[in-house]
């Protein structure tokens, strides 16, 4: 989970239209939020990921569901309120169900900074406080089959790839052409842990704080005078979304 920025409210969702949709929902319970002018900007906001688990959406069986942060049956007047709607994977949406976030608060990625409530260790989420604990439980963020195993598989693959690049840099100083190719590949691989990609909070945490490969790569590239502004920017971006352990 990473902090999200709410995009501008769709022009189509006027106060009049919002009242109309709320009344329709109250009358017949229809899915009034299933409008392309609502779902498209929500997906764009998260780069086609679940706002909670960061699982990829609209791929294979992981289709987007619209989560009402304040549950639609408990807070009917907010059924299409902009800022109450989040793109969600089925697992998170089903598990959260009718959880009352006002009675038992959970992290709202639109309003909260996840690192204030959660940290990651070995591809699993841990609580910093009660709100963090509620979040893990309400969303099943540590479900092994749905989330932990996929996160770890990707994380280990990225580390193995970076270790191969590090080994190539340590064997001997590459030719300028080979060096440029290696640096570009390192940048591309590190960017896979960034906010546009799946499981970015977990992967950035693993790369920066759990695996030694990032520190060794940085040291080697600095020694070769190849650690540049782009690599520094990538590292800072990963730091901004990582959820390191307070230990």
Language-model regions: role of each:
Residues 146-247:
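C-terminal, charged low-complexity interaction regions
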Residues 4, 17, 21, 132-142, ...:
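Generic hydrophobic, helix-prone segments enriched in Leu/Val/Ile
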Residues 96, 100-181:
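Conserved, surface-exposed functional patches that form binding/active-site neighborhoods
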Residues 84-99, 127-140, 204-212, 231-234:
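Short, surface-exposed, charge-dense and proline/glycine-enriched linear segments
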Residues 1-8, 242-247:
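Short, Lys/Arg-enriched, disordered terminal segments
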Residues 3-49, 73-80:
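Short, charged surface segments at domain edges that flank catalytic/cofactor-binding sites
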Residues 37-63, 89-92:
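Short cysteine-rich loop/turn motifs with clustered Cys
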Residues 55-87, 96-117:
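Histidine-centered nuclease catalytic patch
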